[in-house]
A protein has these predicted regions:
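Extracytoplasmic gate region of multi-pass secondary transporters
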Residues: 15, 206-247
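A membrane-interface helix-boundary motif in multi-pass transporters
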Residues: 28, 67, 149-166, 349-373
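Helix-to-loop junctions at the C-terminal end of transmembrane segments
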Residues: 46-67, 256-268, 352
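Helix-loop-helix hairpin linking two adjacent transmembrane segments in secondary transporters
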Residues: 90-91, 123, 128-180
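Paired small-residue
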Residues: 92-101, 294-302
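Cytoplasmic helix-loop-helix junction between adjacent transmembrane helices
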Residues: 99-135
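C-terminal transmembrane helical hairpin of 12-TM major facilitator-type secondary transporters
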Residues: 268-314
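A late C-terminal transmembrane helix in Major Facilitator Superfamily
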Residues: 324-357
Length: 395
């Protein structure tokens, strides 16, 4: 539920509302690209804050200890307030609001992920941690359906921002008791007998490649995730089903997270990560090959299916490689993901500016995104050979 608020509303409500804002004349496509980048820049800033928090706190001993549940609560409240703020008729303030919403999203994501994965590790059920990543999918479905209904009712974007802000507070109230007083997330110690998988070296190079490959996923999906409703309108003008492609993406996210949580993984997660990238690349390819109702629907589903599964597997890899500093390195990986997201929208704006039509610009943007995802998948396959896994006993 917390991730549904922070990600489904705080980050992704902008996507289904973008056509409404364009229709109302309060924004144009180049401005929308930069507004999206402001949110992703905030996401990067929040992730970096999580990354360097242990370093800062170690050098400033007077700072109070970080309380994970309190950070989650603060992020949820900030998300609701900042979403409501987008209804204000102050376009000059919108980039700052979206930036701050990105910071809040990153804080909630990192601390919720660390808390849940730590709890599941203690219960010796790490795969069940993937259930939390159904939250963004549920949030995307709900926000997409709400936006579709508001379009049919001829509401304005300002009304939609108010609705989503109120919805964020309602959902936050439901999950509020879960994050009461509790311990700050800590990496779980291995316990019990048996065997675990470990690569032959846990050096900085391996972690660096993982973070870069994960960052590529941020770039690869963001073009479609930000502009899907606009791309669909350019390809299928007048269709009554245009507003359903985004909820279909969210449904794929939801289902993919459930599937990932039920997989009995006994092999290398990097192989699953490569497969996720290939699936997302295929989703983009379907839309390019068949820009039709069926093509966009199938493409949206394929793009969404591995979306949070990629995050789940990548965060598990981070915990495997750096168990003692999991939260910090989760922040680093999330920061790389944020950099990938930041690059996407300005690239779209650049390609649109140098294309004969919006459709041609979006096509070129999607081709670049697909190529990036394929490159990321190949990186994981290369890592499989560079750092093969071996079984080690744990006690």
């Amino acid at each position: 539920m917390a991730l549904a608020v922070a990600m489904g509303i705080g980050r992704f409500a902008f996507t289904p509302l973008l056509p409404m804002m364009l229709h109302d004349g309060v924004i144009d496509l180049p401005s929308a690209s930069w507004l999206a980048s402001a949110n992703y820049l905030g996401y990067l800033a929040g992730a970096l804050l999580c990354t360097f928090q242990p370093w800062i706190w170690a050098r400033v001993p007077r700072l109070p200890p970080v309380d994970g549940p309190w950070m989650v609560r603060a992020g949820l409240v900030a998300t609701g307030l900042l979403t409501l703020g987008m209804a204000l008729p102050w376009p000059a303030a919108w980039p700052l609001l979206r930036f701050a919403a990105g910071v809040a999203s990153a804080l909630v994501f990192v601390y919720v992920s660390g808390w849940v994965l730590s709890q599941m590790a203690r219960l010796q059920a790490p795969a069940m941690g993937g259930v939390m990543y159904t939250g963004p999918g549920a949030g995307i479905v709900v926000s997409g359906l709400f936006a579709s209904a508001m379009v049919q009712w001829h509401w304005h974007a300002v009304d939609a921002w108010l609705v989503f802000g109120g919805l964020a507070f309602v959902l936050s109230a439901l999950v509020w008791p879960t994050f009461g007083r509790g311990e700050t997330p800590r990496p779980a110690a291995a316990s019990g007998g048996g065997a675990a998988l470990a690569s032959e070296a846990h050096g900085a190079v391996e972690v660096g490649f993982l973070c870069v490959a994960y960052g590529i996923a941020g770039f690869g999906y963001i073009v479609t995730a930000t502009f899907l409703p606009v791309i669909a309108r350019a390809a299928l003008p007048g269709s009554p089903w245009l507003d359903l492609f985004w909820p279909i993406f969210g449904f794929g996210v939801f289902c993919g997270a459930l599937i990932a949580s039920r997989l009995r993984v006994s092999g290398d997660l990097r192989l699953l990560l490569a497969g996720g990238y290939f699936i997302q690349a295929a989703g983009i390819a379907v839309g390019l090959w068949s820009p039709s109702l069926a093509g966009f629907a199938i493409g949206s589903l394929l793009l969404g299916l591995p979306f949070t599964a990629i995050t789940f597997f990548a965060m598990q890899e981070v915990r495997r490689l750096r168990p003692a500093l999991a939260a910090s390195f989760m922040g680093l990986a999330t920061a790389m993901y944020g950099i990938g997201q930041i690059v996407g929208p300005p690239l779209v704006a650049l390609l649109l500016r140098h294309s004969d039509s919006p459709g041609a610009g979006f096509t070129r943007s999607l081709q670049v995104a697909m190529a990036a995802l394929l490159a990321g998948a190949l990186m994981y396959l290369w890592m499989l050979r560079a750092w093969p896994m071996r079984r080690v006993a744990v006690s």
